[in-house]
A protein has these predicted regions:
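Membrane-interfacial helix-loop segments of redox and metal-homeostasis proteins
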Residues: 1-173
Length: 173
């Protein structure tokens, strides 16, 4: 269970770190991210802008909490909560027929849709699994090879998550 926890922890930390980097890579990128939240009209404009800032802060908190060994359970909880909020927002927007590009990782022009909901649910399940694995791993001692394998699996998973829009376009075109 220890290696499963490490994989889930690294996966979520990597995905959120890449998401943050894509959103804050420049003033225009951050503006596009905030605008993509506002244009969904889930909340009033001012509240949507504050929600965009809060979501970015929650992503950053997830990365920090997952990185520190004594805050891992809280990191998983914050990650799952953040993913739940993001998924809920996407679902509300889809029900209202509103579309905006997914600026989750930066400059994508793919509109938010069902694949993004599924992606977020899989990531949330990874967070819940990681929390359960953390609780079950107790005082287990990690072997370097096991840690390396878990980190490689997390890196592959993060790559698939981040490039999901491109992969879907490639295989559905």
């Amino acid at each position: 269970m220890l290696y499963l926890m490490i994989m889930c922890r690294a996966l979520l930390a990597a995905v959120f770190a890449i998401a943050i980097a894509g959103k804050v890579r420049g003033r225009s990128a951050y503006g596009e991210y905030v605008s993509s939240i506002v244009v969904l009209k889930i909340l009033p404009r001012t509240v949507s802008t504050m929600a965009a800032h809060a979501l970015l802060a929650a992503e950053a908190a997830s990365v920090v909490l997952l990185a520190l060994p004594w805050t891992v359970p809280l990191g998983f909880a914050v990650a799952v909560g953040t993913l739940a909020a993001l998924t809920g927002g996407i679902l509300v927007a889809l029900r209202r027929g509103r579309q905006a590009p997914c600026r989750c990782f930066g400059a994508s022009v793919t509109p938010l849709g069902r694949p993004h909901v599924i992606r977020n649910l899989v990531l949330a399940a990874s967070g819940a699994t990681g929390l359960a694995a953390w609780a079950a791993s107790g005082a287990a001692v990690a072997h370097p090879a096991g840690v390396a394998l878990a980190l490689v699996a997390a890196a592959v998973g993060a790559l698939l998550v981040v490039r999901l829009d491109d992969l879907l376009e490639l295989f559905t075109a």
